[in-house]
C-alpha cells in the first residue's frame, strides 16, 4: 500500500512541479464542530460494512483471509496513521536525496499528529506567510484534493493565481461508484486529472454581477462580491451546519439566492460580508435577504407537496404495472426521484449535475456527490426498518405534511409547527427555545466563515441541533444577534477517536479505552446506541439522511479518558496521543548522515541522506488585529 502511495505522490509532483514549496497535509484532530459529521459518517460506514458482510455470508461467499481493512483507521491517533507519517518522512528524505526535481523545493509535512483538517492547515500556512517579508503576491498555488470545500477555500484567499487539481470522475452506471477510475489510480496519466483555475471562476462571478454596478449607491468591488458569494453558498450546506429546510440546490436555491442578492444589494447600503475582509458579515443585511427567502417558503413547500404526491402516484402506477425500479431499493432506506416539477423536465445530464451540486453543498465528499448524481432513482417509501439496522422515516414529504398544503390545511404555519415539533421537539409558540435555535445557527454561520478566513474561532464550539431553523425564523431579529467564541484547546487524538468512532471500530483505540464504547455499563453507553436512526424525509440520496446520533458530552468523555492511568498505555500509545510538530525538509547537498529505510523490503536506506528535516510547532490562534484574507 505504501509503495502505491509513494508512486501516486511521485506522479502528482511531476505533473505540478512545484518550484518553491510542497505542503503535504494530513488530517489531524478536527474542531468539535466537524466531529458531529465525522461521527455520523463513521457510524453509517460501520453499519454498511456489517450489512455487506452479512449479504456475502448469505450468498455463501468465503470470508477474506485475515482481518478486513477498517477504513475508520484513517483517523488521527491510530497505529496506521502513525506508520503513515513515518513512511512519508522517509519518502521525502529519499526524494530530496535522489530526485533533482524535489531538491529545488522546500517540503513541509503536517501529519496526523498536527491538529487541524488537512486543507485548513494549508490555508493556515498561506494566511501566516502572506504577512511575512518577501511574500510574492503573484506566485501560483495549486491545491490537490477531493474535498468539496476546496473551491470556497481557494476563493476566500483572494489570491490571483490559484488552481485546484483532482482526478477525473466518471458518471453513470459502471463508473466505479463515482470514484476515480481504476486506471487513473493504478497507472496515472495526465489525462486522468482535471485542473480548475479559480481565477477564471472569479472572472465569471465578476461578469455575472458587474451588471448591477451602476445601480449601487456604493463602489462596485469584485472582491467583496466573491466574499458575499461564499457566504450565500454557506446557507445551502456545509460540513458544520445543516442546510436551511427550503434551500435545496436541486430546486434552484442557489439561483434564487443569487437573483435575490442582485435585486436587494442596491438597497442594503453595502455588501453583506464584513468590511474587514476577515470572515465576518453584516447580520442586518443578511437578515433582509433571508426575509425575502422566507417569503418564498410557502411556495417551495407547496411545490414539494405536489411533486411528492405526483411521484407517489407514478410509483403506484409502475407498481401496478409490474415494473419496479432498478438500482437502490426501498429496503436500503434510500431516497429516490424528485425535486421540483421543473426538475423532472430537464435533461438527464442537467439532473445529474444538480444532484452532484446538491451533494457538494450539503457537505458530502466529492466522490459521494458524483456517486449520487450517477445513481438511479429509488422508490418513494422505504421500509421502516432496514436490514442494515438503519431506521428510516418516509422519504420526500410525508402524507401528513402534504395535507398542510391541501385545501383547508394548515399551510406554512401548520407545516412549521409540525416541523419544529417532530424534528426539534419545540413548540412554535415557545420563544426561548426558538431563540436558542436561531442564536446557535447564527453562531454557526459566524464560526464557519471565520474558519474559512481566519482559522478556528473555537475548538470546542459545535451546532447542538440536528436541523436548521426555517429561513423566515432565522431572519427574525438576526440583525441584533452577536457571537463570541472561546478559542479553547483541540481534542487529543484518543479523545477524538472515542468521540467519532463506532463500537465496531473500538479496536482502533488502546485496549484500556475500548470498554467505554462497548460495555453496557459504560458511562458513555448512551452515546453508542445499538440502533442507528436516520431521517430520510425530504432527501433524495442516502448520504443526505440526517443521522440522529446523540451529541457527545465533551466533559464526560474527557473525564472517562482521564480515568485511565497513563501506566496502562505503552510508550508508543502515549506518543500517538500527543500533539506533534510540522517537519520541514530542505535539500542538503553535503549529506546529513545515514537514514534507515522504513520499508526495507521495497527501498534501501539512504547512505548518506541528503535532506535535512527540522521540526517546527504549528502557529497558534491568528491575531485578531492582523489582516488575513478578504478583498
Per-segment meaning from a language model:
Residues 1-631:
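Noncatalytic, typically N-terminal accessory segments of nucleic acid-processing enzymes
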Amino acid at each position: 500500500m505504501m509503495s502505491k502511495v509513494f508512486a501516486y505522490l511521485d506522479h502528482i509532483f511531476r505533473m505540478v512541479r512545484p518550484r518553491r514549496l510542497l505542503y503535504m497535509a494530513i488530517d489531524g484532530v478536527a474542531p468539535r464542530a466537524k466531529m458531529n459529521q465525522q461521527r455520523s459518517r463513521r457510524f453509517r460506514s460501520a453499519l454498511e460494512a456489517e450489512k455487506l458482510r452479512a449479504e456475502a455470508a448469505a450468498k455463501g461467499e468465503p470470508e477474506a483471509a485475515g482481518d478486513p481493512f477498517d477504513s475508520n483507521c484513517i483517523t488521527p491517533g491510530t497505529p496506521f496513521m502513525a506508520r503513515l507519517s513515518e513512511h512519508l518522512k522517509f519518502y521525502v528524505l529519499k526524494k530530496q536525496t535522489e530526485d533533482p526535481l524535489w531538491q529545488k523545493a522546500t517540503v513541509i509535512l503536517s501529519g496526523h499528529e498536527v491538529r487541524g483538517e488537512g486543507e485548513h492547515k494549508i490555508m493556515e500556512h498561506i494566511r501566516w506567510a502572506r504577512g511575512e517579508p518577501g511574500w510574492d503576491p503573484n506566485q501560483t498555488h495549486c491545491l490537490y484534493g477531493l474535498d468539496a470545500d476546496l473551491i470556497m477555500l481557494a476563493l476566500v484567499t483572494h489570491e490571483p493565481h490559484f488552481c485546484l487539481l483532482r482526478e477525473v470522475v466518471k458518471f453513470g452506471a459502471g463508473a466505479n461508484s463515482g470514484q476515480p477510475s481504476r486506471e487513473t489510480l493504478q497507472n496515472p496519466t495526465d489525462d486522468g486529472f482535471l485542473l480548475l483555475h479559480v481565477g477564471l471562476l472569479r472572472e465569471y462571478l465578476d461578469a455575472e454581477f458587474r451588471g448591477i454596478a451602476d445601480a449601487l449607491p456604493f463602489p462596485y468591488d469584485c472582491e467583496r462580491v466573491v466574499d458575499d458569494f461564499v457566504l450565500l453558498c454557506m446557507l445551502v450546506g456545509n460540513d458544520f451546519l445543516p442546510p436551511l429546510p427550503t434551500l435545496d440546490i436541486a430546486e434552484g436555491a442557489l439561483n434564487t439566492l443569487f437573483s435575490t442578492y442582485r435585486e436587494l444589494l442596491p438597497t442594503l447600503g453595502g455588501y453583506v460580508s464584513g468590511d474587514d475582509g476577515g470572515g465576518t458579515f453584516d447580520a442586518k443585511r443578511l437578515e433582509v435577504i433571508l426575509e425575502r427567502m422566507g417569503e418564498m417558503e410557502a411556495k417551495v413547500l407547496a411545490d414539494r407537496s405536489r411533486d411528492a404526491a405526483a411521484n407517489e402516484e407514478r410509483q403506484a402506477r409502475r407498481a401496478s404495472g409490474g415494473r419496479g425500479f432498478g438500482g437502490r431499493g426501498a429496503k436500503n432506506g434510500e431516497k429516490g426521484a424528485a425535486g421540483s416539477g421543473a426538475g423532472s423536465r430537464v435533461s438527464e445530464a442537467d439532473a445529474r449535475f444538480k444532484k452532484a451540486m446538491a451533494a457538494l453543498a450539503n457537505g458530502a465528499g466529492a466522490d459521494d456527490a458524483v456517486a449520487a448524481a450517477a445513481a438511479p432513482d429509488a422508490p418513494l417509501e422505504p421500509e421502516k426498518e432496514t436490514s442494515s439496522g438503519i431506521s428510516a422515516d418516509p422519504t420526500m414529504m410525508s402524507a401528513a405534511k402534504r395535507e398542510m398544503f391541501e385545501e383547508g390545511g394548515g399551510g406554512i404555519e401548520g407545516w412549521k409547527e409540525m416541523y419544529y415539533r417532530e424534528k426539534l421537539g419545540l413548540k412554535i409558540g415557545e420563544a426561548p427555545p426558538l431563540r436558542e435555535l436561531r442564536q446557535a445557527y447564527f453562531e454557526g454561520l459566524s464560526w464557519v466563515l471565520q474558519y474559512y478566513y481566519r482559522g478556528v474561532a473555537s475548538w470546542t464550539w459545535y451546532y447542538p441541533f440536528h436541523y436548521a431553523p426555517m429561513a423566515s425564523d432565522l431572519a427574525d431579529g438576526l440583525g441584533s444577534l452577536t457571537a463570541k467564541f472561546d478559542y479553547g484547546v483541540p481534542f487529543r487524538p484518543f479523545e477524538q477517536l472515542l468521540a467519532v468512532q463506532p463500537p465496531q471500530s473500538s479496536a482502533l483505540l488502546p485496549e484500556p479505552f475500548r470498554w467505554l464504547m462497548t460495555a453496557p455499563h459504560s458511562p458513555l453507553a448512551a452515546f453508542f446506541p445499538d440502533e442507528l436512526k436516520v431521517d430520510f424525509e425530504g432527501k433524495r440520496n442516502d448520504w443526505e439522511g440526517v443521522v440522529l446520533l446523540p451529541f457527545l458530552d465533551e466533559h464526560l468523555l474527557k473525564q472517562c479518558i482521564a480515568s485511565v492511568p497513563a501506566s496502562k498505555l505503552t510508550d508508543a500509545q502515549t506518543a500517538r496521543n500527543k500533539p506533534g510538530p510540522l517537519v520541514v525538509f530542505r535539500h542538503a547537498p553535503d549529506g546529513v548522515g545515514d537514514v534507515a529505510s522504513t520499508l526495507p523490503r521495497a527501498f534501501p536506506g539512504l547512505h548518506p541522506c541528503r535532506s535535512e528535516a527540522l521540526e517546527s510547532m504549528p502557529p497558534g490562534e491568528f491575531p485578531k488585529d492582523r489582516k488575513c484574507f478578504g478583498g
